[in-house]
Amino acid sequence: MSANCMFNLDNDYIYWKPITYPKALVFISHGAGKHSGRYDELAENISSLGILVFSHDHIGHGRSNGEKMMIDDFGTARGNY
């Protein structure tokens, strides 16, 4: 198996081809009622150190779909991360 792949909870194979290889990967997870854009400056600072930064808007937050701030099942929500 390639180091440039992962599987999601539905067992879908996700592949990417990096242009450069970062020193590390940081995932920024926002809090309730927030969105990933709040961390743009932090992400840029970390990225300038050669570290790959990833974040997303959780379902029901920011630009993602879903009823705002509504999580019916944390098990399902956890599958999105």
UniProtKB/Swiss-Prot annotation:
It comes from the Viruses. Pfam families: Hydrolase_4. Gene3D superfamilies: alpha/beta hydrolase. Belongs to the poxviridae K6 protein family. This is Protein K6. The lineage of its organism: Viruses, Varidnaviria, Bamfordvirae, Nucleocytoviricota, Pokkesviricetes.
